[in-house]
UniProtKB/Swiss-Prot annotation:
Gene3D superfamilies (alphabetical): 3.30.60.20, P-loop containing nucleotide triphosphate hydrolases
Name of the encoding gene: TK1A
Residue runs in coiled coils: none
Group of enzyme by EC: transferase
Traits of the deletion mutant: No visible phenotype. The double mutant tk1a tk1b is seedling lethal.
Organism: Arabidopsis thaliana (Mouse-ear cress)
Name of protein: Thymidine kinase a
Residue numbers annotated as active site: E116
Binding locations of substrate: Y147, T191, E192, L193, I194, G195, Y200
InterPro entries in alphabetical order: P-loop_NTPase (IPR027417), Thymidine_kinase (IPR001267), Thymidine_kinase_CS (IPR020633)
Length: 238
């Protein structure tokens, strides 16, 4: 009896729900998520812009997004380290984009590019909605790790839902070999510290380790110096 009920349910789903669902999918088209990641100065934004321009050349409607936190080169453009720019929407979050862009205009979009994706806390949710529910192509560019080589934001979280993942490398500023990591030049410990070549540099494994040790040692010296200075000031006032 249970088998008959299950069989009836499957047939019902096949004929009604599944048919409507597949029909809806065909109308919307097939969505996709493509991830471009790597350290700073590895050409992520350049690669993203190249992909976006290719989509435009193929006649697709495109929108570019970036985090409003990134104001290094321009507030309303995605700009590469080489100075190449492309107009974009600068947003504090992603899920509000369809409404801000206008639902009619949003529904006509084929492709959405996202730069500096590590700054968006709702990246996973947005990519699922855009690709799975709305049938659009999402091309995401962002850092895969922070200056401590830990997961940064939600970029790594979207790998399980990605159709493709491209990991780029930079060139080590010390030896010229392939660079997989981002080294912070100063002793600031904030996870989010927006900057360019004045704050960060790409390095290989060897020079990440050696330079990181030096920076940590320098930080300790500064902390000890500040502590000694503070103790000296306290002693002088007693």
């Amino acid at each position: 009896m249970a088998t008959l009920k299950a069989s009836f349910l499957i047939k019902t789903l096949d004929s009604d729900v599944t048919g409507d669902f597949l029909s809806d999918l065909e109308r919307r088209g097939s969505g996709a998520v493509h991830v471009i990641m790597g350290p700073m100065f590895s050409g992520k934004s350049t690669s993203l812009l190249r992909r976006i321009k290719s989509e435009i050349s193929d006649g697709r409607s495109v929108a570019m997004l970036k985090s409003s936190k990134d104001t290094r080169y321009a507030k309303d453009s995605v700009v590469t380290h080489d100075g190449i720019g492309f107009p974009c929407w600068a947003l504090p979050d992603l899920m509000s984009f369809p409404e801000k862009f206008g639902l009619d205009a949003y529904n006509k979009l084929d492709v959405i590019g996202i730069d500096e994706a590590q700054f968006f806390g709702d990246l996973y949710e947005f990519c699922c909605k855009v690709a799975d529910d709305d049938g659009k192509i999402v091309i995401v560019a962002g850092l895969d790790g922070d200056y401590l080589r830990r997961s940064f934001g939600a970029v790594l979280d979207i790998i399980p839902i990605a159709d493709s993942v491209t990991k780029l490398t930079a060139r080590c500023e010390v030896c010229g070999h392939k660079a997989f990591f981002t080294l912070r030049k100063n002793c600031d410990t904030r996870t989010e510290l927006i900057g360019g070549a004045d704050v960060y540099m790409p390095v290989c494994r060897k020079h990440y380790i050696t330079n990181h040790i030096v920076i940590k040692a320098s930080k300790k010296v500064l902390e000890d110096s500040d502590k000694a200075r503070a103790e000296s000031c306290v002693a002088a006032t007693i």
